[in-house]
Structure formats: C-alpha cells, structure tokens
C-alpha cells in the first residue's frame, strides 16, 4: 500500500515552527450524520478526539517502525546500511462521534520514536524528524458523501501543555501558561515507503493498582505499587503549584526512590487549579514513586500492549511459581508500541538477542500472534540490503550485541512463529534474508569460527554472566550460526526448497570441525574447559562425547546454581532436561543460590533482573527464557518433533522430588491444553485434557 491508497490525497503536515508535542485541529460542518471513518497516522504517537470524545482508547499509536532513512555519521562516516522502511496507519469508525453542525477533530501528537533523538555514536543523537500528522476523514450525511483531508488549508496547530519531553525520562506538563493562538502548518512530502494498516495490538490501560503510602516527610510522599510494572500514576492536583514525581524500581536506604534504579524518570506538573494528571506521551517503568507538591494519588494505571495472558501455571514450590509470574509481568512490561523491548525504561529497544531468546515463551504463554507478526517485519526491515548484516535491534537504533545471538533472530523468530501458529508465510518471505545473513557471517569468520562483526560494533558471545566472562565469544557465535543453519535446512524442507540445503549442510560440517579444532580437549571431553556452560552449547549441537554431558551434570550439581549468561542459562537447563538429568534441571530452576531465580525472589523482586545479582535494570525478560520448560518438561506439554500449531504433542510430565503438585494450561491454535500432576500415596500421577483434534503421544512415567 502507498500513501494515496491509505490517505487518499491528504498531506502530511507539521508545525511551521518547532513545537514539542503539538495539537492539530480541523473543523468541518456536518448535517445529520449517517456514518464516518477516520484514516489517520501521527508520528511519533498520537491521540485524537472528535467533538471532545476519544476516537479510541488506543495508546502509543502508531506502532514503532523504521519509518524512513536517517542521515547520521557512524564512527565519522555516513551510515550506509540500507534498510526497508514502513509506516502504519489506523482506521476508526467515528460515526457515533459526529454531531449536526460544526465538528472539531483535535489530534495530540507527541514525539514518540519518530521525533525522539536516539544515540547514534559518540556524542551524537539523531531523530527521524519533527512531529507530523496525516488524516482523511470520510463521512456521509443527508447531503451525501464528504471527505476532509489534512493539509495547510484545513489544519491548524498550537503548542500543548507538554513543554519538555524525553521518551526515556519523562514529561513536563504546564497547565499555567496559555497555549497561544492557532497557527498555520506546512505540508511535507509523503513517505515513499510501504504503508500498512496497524494489525498489531496497541497499548492500553490493562488494569489499575491502588498503591500503598509508605511514609511522608517534609511534604514528600513515597508510594509502593507492590509490583514492578509500566504505566503512570494518576494524580489529582489539588491547588496551584508544582508537582514532581520521581520513579524507581527500588528504594534506597533512606526510604526514598533509589537513584541507581530510577533511570532518570521524572514527571513534572505545573497547575493553577485542580485537575487530573497522568503521563501522556510516554510510560514509566517503576514500582516505587515519590510525590512532592499539592496532589493526591488516585491510582496507578498499568499500561502495555493489549496482549492477553493465555496460560496458567500453579505450583506450591515458591520459586517455580515466582518464575512464571515474574516472567509474565516482565514480558508484558516490555511490550510497547509493537516491539518486545529489553527493558521498559533505560533503553526500551527491540533487542534482537533478548527478543529471539524469549520469543517461544512469549508466543506460548501470551496471545501474541499479531504482536510478533509485526516485529517480524521490523527484523526483516533492519537487515542491510547490501551485505546481509543483521542489527542488534529492530527497529534499528545503535546499541551493543553480537553477530550470532542477536543476528539469529532472522531465523529463530520466524521459525518459532511457524511452530507456534502454523503460519509459514514469514519464513517464506524471510528465507532469502536468512541466506544473506549467513553470507554476512561468512564474511566475518576466520578458521571456521565467527570472530567479528562490522568495524565499530561489539561482538558479544553470551551476556550478563556472573563474574568475568570466560566462555569464548567465537564459540557462542558459531553455536548460533550452526543452530541457524540447521533451522534453515528444516525451513527449506517445510517450504519445499531444495537448492541450498547441500551448501548449508557443508557449512554446518565445517563449523562443527572448527569447534572441535579450537575448543575440544580430547583428554577431558570438555570444550573451552566447560566454562560458563560451554559444554552445554556443544552438547546441544550434538558435539562431544559422554564425558561432555557428564561434566555438565557434575559441574551444576556441585555449584547448585547458574554460572551462565542469558543464552547459557537457557541452554544448560534444556540440555539437562532433555538428556537424562531432569532432577538437576529442576534443582537449578528452584535454587536459591547467588545466581538463581530463587535469589531474585528472596530479594523481593517481582520482575526478572538484568543481572543475576541485581544492578541496573530490574525488568529484563532475557533470563526468563526457561519459563517455557515449566510447561514443556515439568507439565510435559511439548510439541512433537515436526509438528506445528500444536497439532501433535508429546505428554511427558515430570514431578520433581519434594514437589507434590503442579498444574497449568496453554491456549493453543487447536484449543486449550491442560495438565495436572500430583502425588497419591507417594506415587506421582498425571492427567491431561486435550482437544480431540490434537494427537497426543503419552509417555508412561511421571518421574
């Protein structure tokens, strides 16, 4: 779809001078209205009212995408990677909002990701452009059909109450100054990129929390929501003055929001009469907040993408239950504007490493099909058309990562999307891009190992290990290359493509030989001294011998906790479950050691930490990937090899020693799957409830 197909002959408009978050207004006359439809997009984010009534409850729309090419320097030279670009529009039925006589359409456009400068290197930041709006309002009254198109002759603008804005750190809203007269707008050229109707869930207020007042001192009130979420407090400003709200994920020793964990997030309101106050153009990631000034706290609105929870899990063992609950809370807090982010405050980016790692869990446990379909487009857009190089984030903003664990999103996410939902179209569309990414990895390989990324970029292997990194980066990056090559072979078979499979298999063999040559010790059976899960990466590829696996089990039985980063934690857990060490895998999941989920729970966390021991962000989903093993290897609800859309499953439950009951459910494309495990007279038992259309292969034992 192009501009005219979406917006007819409407023009993009922007203020003639710089404005932070402008209001746009258009007025028109209507007789007795019969119907009306509004086609609209406002970049960065917009909200609209017609005759003072909201057009929609959607928030932070349109979803974030790589809108157009940005011009900036990358390490002193023009950034020359070529991406795909697209923008999203929305269509609303406004029939019930039209009135006889004069009608007023008011649109508030905030910077969002379009007008927010983001870091591009050194001390540079770059935005796409300034806030802009385009709409076509088609309506029918007793006099016939009419169309109101945005343009300099129909739209005016003025400043809004938002006088300072930073997507990451917050807003200043000033209700004491006059907004000024309406001003002319200027027209902009239309986007030449693809236009799509937004088919991804918007953000919205999903629930409300009544926060608890902890204490008051010197006019400062400190509140606790009881959980780490995203959204905004709703305040009632009671008298003229300035109200300052500071947000944090933790409290300091002084009982105030901890500066180490407030990430610069602040809201300032200037008022001269009582009014309700909340964030408008951004969200805050926080558990605690302080309020200074004349205000009452009414509630806290929890805001994220309108994605339902489609799973249940119940365990008397506290850490297993905490892991499920914390993952859902963390993942939902990181679903905004159509992307799965790394954290909801500091960076807010769609990191491909974090996203590919937890995508299977996100698809299994949440009603997220449309959400991930949109993010797949972002992943596809943010590959360099010339070299096949994959970015560390989608949409692209400069940041850190690695070629393997981050770049493999181009293969892993469409493959898991197919497995979960049975839709092969994203794989079909992206398969040529997978091959181009493989070519990019070949260009950054030496001696059969992936050893570098583009100059000026990081080349991470695993990430956020406790202590000093000891697992070699090339081992990890080559692991992901081999895994992706194997997945591409499976994808080619699913799609009926024969041409490249021999080449891909030859590359697999070459890379496996390189891992043996560089890292395998035939005297011990270990790879890279079994450091930080190195053996598990290799066993997962089918490399090594019996000693390689046994040394994994010995190491983690002795440690009693993890020593791995985000990728190794997932792989170690799965390798132990799949290769005869279920009890040990369960012990790691329930461990309360220093590097464990139990440690996070015991320190009061309600979401997953970025680092095992805390520090920086307290809301990072990346360590949550093993949550899916609660369903696949404990409840035993696992898709059969080669199955998609849950048409065929293996029911292979496991009830760990010391745990007397587990239960849970998954809403699949075939219907709801339920499993229950319990002990009766000391014997473990299990039952499954599955729709008749699912072919269930049941294993005999429960433990």
Task: Describe the function of each predicted region.
Residues 1-345, 370-373, 390-396, 425, ...:
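Extracellular/oxidizing-compartment recognition motifs
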Residues 45, 297-326, 330-333, 339-391, ...:
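Active-site acid/base region of carbohydrate-active enzymes
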Residues 107-117, 121-136, 140, 560-592, ...:
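Repeat-solenoid scaffold signature
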Residues 134, 149-176, 198-199, 254, ...:
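Non-catalytic C-terminal accessory modules of carbohydrate-active enzymes
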Residues 231-238, 242-249, 289, 354-382, ...:
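Alpha-helical support elements that line or immediately flank enzyme active sites
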Residues 351-363, 372-373, 404-416, 474-489, ...:
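Well-ordered alpha-helical segments within folded domains of soluble proteins
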Residues 489-505, 570, 580:
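Carbohydrate-binding surfaces of carbohydrate-active enzymes
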Residues 524, 555-563, 594-597:
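Solenoid-like repeat scaffolds
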């Amino acid at each position: 779809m192009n501009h005219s197909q979406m917006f007819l002959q409407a023009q993009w408009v922007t203020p003639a001078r710089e404005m932070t978050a402008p209001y746009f207004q258009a007025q028109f006359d209507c007789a007795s209205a019969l119907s009306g439809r509004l086609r609209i997009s406002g970049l960065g984010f917009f909200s609209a009212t017609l005759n003072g009534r909201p057009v929609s409850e959607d928030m932070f729309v349109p979803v974030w995408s790589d809108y157009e090419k940005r011009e900036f320097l990358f390490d002193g030279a023009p950034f020359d990677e070529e991406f795909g670009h697209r923008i999203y529009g929305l269509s609303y039925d406004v029939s019930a909002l039209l009135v006889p006589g004069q009608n007023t359409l008011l649109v508030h456009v905030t910077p969002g990701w379009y007008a927010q400068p983001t870091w591009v290197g050194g001390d540079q930041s770059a935005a796409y452009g300034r806030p802009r709006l385009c709409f076509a309002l088609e309506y029918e009254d007793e006099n016939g059909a009419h169309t109101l198109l945005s343009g300099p002759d129909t739209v005016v603008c003025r400043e809004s109450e938002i006088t300072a804005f930073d997507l990451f750190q917050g807003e200043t809203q000033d209700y004491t100054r006059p907004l000024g007269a309406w001003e002319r707008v200027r027209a902009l050229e239309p986007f030449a990129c693809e236009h799509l109707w937004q088919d991804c869930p918007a953000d919205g207020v999903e629930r409300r929390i009544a926060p608890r007042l902890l204490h008051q001192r010197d006019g400062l009130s400190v509140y606790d929501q009881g959980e780490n979420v995203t959204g905004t407090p709703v305040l009632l400003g009671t008298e003229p003055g300035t109200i300052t709200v500071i947000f944090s994920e933790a409290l300091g020793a002084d009982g105030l929001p901890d500066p180490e964990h407030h990430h610069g997030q602040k809201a300032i309101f200037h008022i001269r009469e009582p009014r309700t106050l909340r964030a408008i153009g951004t969200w805050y990631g926080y558990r605690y907040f302080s309020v200074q000034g004349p205000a009452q706290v009414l509630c806290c609105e929890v805001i994220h993408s309108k994605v339902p929870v489609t799973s249940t899990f119940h365990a008397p063992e506290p850490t297993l239950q905490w892991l499920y609950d914390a993952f859902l809370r963390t993942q939902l807090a990181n679903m905004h504007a159509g992307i799965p982010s790394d954290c909801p405050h500091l960076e807010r980016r769609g990191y491909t490493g974090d996203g590919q790692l937890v995508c299977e869990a996100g698809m299994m446990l949440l009603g997220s099909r449309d959400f991930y379909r949109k993010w797949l487009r972002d992943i596809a857009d943010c590959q360099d058309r010339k070299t096949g190089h994959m970015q560390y984030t989608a949409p692209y903003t400069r940041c850190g990562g690695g070629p393997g664990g981050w770049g493999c999103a181009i293969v892993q996410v469409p493959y898991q999307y197919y497995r979960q939902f049975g839709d092969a179209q994203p794989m079909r569309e992206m398969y040529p891009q997978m091959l181009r990414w493989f070519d990019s990895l070949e260009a950054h390989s030496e001696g059969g190992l992936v050893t570098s990324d583009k100059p000026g970029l990081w080349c991470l292997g695993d990430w956020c290990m406790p202590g000093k990194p000891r697992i070699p980066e090339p081992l990890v990056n080559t692991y992901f290359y081999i895994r992706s090559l194997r997945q591409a072979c499976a994808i080619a078979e699913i799609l009926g493509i024969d041409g490249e499979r021999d080449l891909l298999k030859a590359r697999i063999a070459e890379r496996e030989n390189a891992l043996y040559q560089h890292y395998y010790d035939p005297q011990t059976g270990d790879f890279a001294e079994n450091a930080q899960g190195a053996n598990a990466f290799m066993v997962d590829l089918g490399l090594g011998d019996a000693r390689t696996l046994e040394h994994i089990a010995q190491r983690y039985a002795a440690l009693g906790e993890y020593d791995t980063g985000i990728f190794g934690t997932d792989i170690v857990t799965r390798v132990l479950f799949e290769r005869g060490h279920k009890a040990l895998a369960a012990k790691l999941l329930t461990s309360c050691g220093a590097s464990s989920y139990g440690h996070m729970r015991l320190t009061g966390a309600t979401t997953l930490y970025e680092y095992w021991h805390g520090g920086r962000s307290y809301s990072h989903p990346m360590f949550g990937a093993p949550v899916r093993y609660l369903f696949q290897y404990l409840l035993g609800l696992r898709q059969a090899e080669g199955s998609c859309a849950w048409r065929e499953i293996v029911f292979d439950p496991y009830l760990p020693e010391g745990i007397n009951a587990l239960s849970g459910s998954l809403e699949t494309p075939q219907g709801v799957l339920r499993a229950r495990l319990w002990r009766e007279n000391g014997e473990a038992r299990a039952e499954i409830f599955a729709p008749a259309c699912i072919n269930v292969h049941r294993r005999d034992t429960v433990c």
